């Protein structure tokens, strides 16, 4: 895996080993950022971060900050290794449950311009109710939430859908904050 564009274009990144981790491939990541558009100065939240590929891509493309969240120890350590390798600043890594992080950020009044959600596909149905109740409270006005899922699934959140596209076995759905 590599960074697609920006200040760290072409840099290879580490991926955590394990059955639960399915890093977003280069092709899908490039498509995601083509759909999103410029992220200069954005505050980004990368939920279920895994390798951190999505948030790292955002930082490389000019995001002001990124918060990486993954409950898995190896995944969180991998994100830290990638940040160190790439020399990217403006990042925090939390090894905790995504729902807990959303609740903490909402209580603290923290808002994000871009939220990237890429849970293990088989777990998405379990996480959707939590996302539906907690995600809107951390979205800044006119921000975006990107949810990756299996191509056959269509995630539903209480937010307007900007677009939903299939890329092989992956569906990418962009939700807009009101």
Model regions: which residues?
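Class I S-adenosyl-L-methionine-dependent methyltransferase catalytic core
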Residues: 1-178
């Amino acid at each position: 895996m590599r960074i697609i564009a920006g200040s760290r274009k072409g840099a290879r990144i580490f991926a955590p080993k394990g059955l639960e981790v399915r890093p977003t491939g280069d092709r899908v990541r490039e498509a995601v950022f083509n759909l999103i558009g410029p992220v200069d100065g954005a505050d980004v939240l990368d939920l279920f971060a895994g390798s951190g590929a999505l948030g790292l891509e955002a930082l490389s493309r000019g995001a002001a900050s990124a918060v990486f969240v993954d409950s898995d120890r190896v995944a969180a350590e991998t994100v830290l290794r990638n940040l160190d390798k790439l020399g990217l600043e403006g990042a925090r890594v939390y090894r905790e449950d995504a729902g807990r992080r959303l609740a903490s950020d909402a209580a603290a009044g923290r808002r994000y311009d871009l939220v990237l959600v890429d849970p293990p596909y088989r777990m998405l149905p379990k996480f959707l109710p939590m996302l539906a109740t907690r995600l809107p409270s951390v979205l800044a006005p006119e921000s975006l939430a990107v949810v990756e899922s299996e191509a056959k699934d269509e995630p539903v959140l209480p937010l307007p859908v900007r677009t939903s596209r299939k890329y092989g076995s992956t569906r990418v759905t962009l939700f807009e904050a009101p």
